[in-house]
């Protein structure tokens, strides 16, 4: 708004007259030419002039749309997804505990989602704690399942509100719209069965924050209001206006597509369904200074050209291009015929692509037909070159259009994961992938030996086990000794030297080494 106040006669043209700054303007049709003198040349006026017979009178207040207004008003909100964290443990015979973590979904409530959102934006540690998996419980030779419910908040989640129907629009809604948003149902269902969308402001009643109060001066003809001059000095006519309500606020849609509201308007005609308000989007705010600079430069070029023409008392085809009206609307077109300067009143239309007026070589298309030239000369500096091509001076100076194209290409909107058209969700209730990036990682764990006993009992058990182990070793050793004695042969008493046992009749027994020696000497 501040820039509009600084440069009222240039920026208002763009904001209020056209949706985007046009690439070029071309007359809707060419009327009869009238010869003029050089002193009749004038730089185009892109502002509407006041109606004849109407004069400025009293100051009054009116309501208009804010700068940056969008037909789809942005509504900031968040999504809330219900997730059940499960910890399943199994303890085997020797005490090894296997823990497996799982995630499933549940349907949340709007009240619980609002509380979780407040925790998150306020930095309450309870929100982060609620996302962690539960501490698993276990029991010997049993499977134990421990569950914990969490609410995953993803923000921001921006939806759009249509200012005409007051409905919310977003690809994340099942039908693309959420039309039953009231205080009694302060949430919208999404294309994910376990996710709700809620606005940041719990008191949102679809009231539009798109209006601003301004001060202007009425232009009256007796008791009839012809129009008014707004606070930026731009005159607006009431001719062709119709009644249109935006966000429940009655007002008027003016002929140029702008919207205003003031008490007791005299207009009674209602707008048709296709008569909507011009879009004034953020892109225009971003390039506003570029547009203003370009318009100022073109205005200065036109004034410099006019000064040069009047000083030199001569004009060329190229210089006529500076006197073309830059935006759609009524103006004048100029040409040179038989050495005389000519003008005609025309209505300019915007051109967004050169192919609209140059469909083929040598053809300048106006009113769906190729217009004739006079010795290679058309109007407004447009000529036909020696090779048959149409030469338009502005085709070489489309810097402003390049600025807008660059800005359009540099927009990277933040997308909510549910907006992705190719998103597929699990039908069995298991948690979907988009919640994983907003929750701590989970994995399968195998614990050390754990019998589920307290520390002192565990130490007592370990001590008893060690004692029992030593006792067992002692018992094994004793048993081994007793078994070895039973299996060993009986020891005989030693005999005196020189005596031998009585020989057995069937075998010769040598009882000692001495006896063996004596026997061997015989």
Swiss-Prot record:
Gene Ontology CC: one annotated term: membrane
Intravirion topology ranges: 477-522
Keyword Glycoprotein: yes
Membrane topology qualifier: Single-pass type I membrane protein
Post-translational modification comment from the UniProt entry: Glycosylated and palmitoylated by host. Glycosylation is crucial for glycoprotein export at the cell surface.
Database matches in InterPro entries: PH_Rhabdo_glycop, Rhabdo_glycop_CD, Rhabdo_glycop_FD
Subcellular location: Virion membrane
Cleavable signal peptide: 1-25
Alphabetized SUPFAM superfamilies for the sequence: Viral glycoprotein ectodomain-like (SSF161008)
Principal subcellular localisation of the protein: virion
Sequence intervals crossing the membrane: 456-476
Stated family: Belongs to the lyssavirus glycoprotein family.
Summary of the function given for this chain in its UniProt record: Attaches the virus to host cellular receptor, inducing endocytosis of the virion. In the endosome, the acidic pH induces conformational changes in the glycoprotein trimer, which trigger fusion between virus and cell membrane.
Quaternary structure (record): Homotrimer. Interacts with matrix protein.
Protein name (record): Glycoprotein
Organism from which the protein derives: Lagos bat virus (LBV)
High-level lineage: Viruses, Riboviria, Orthornavirae, Negarnaviricota, Haploviricotina
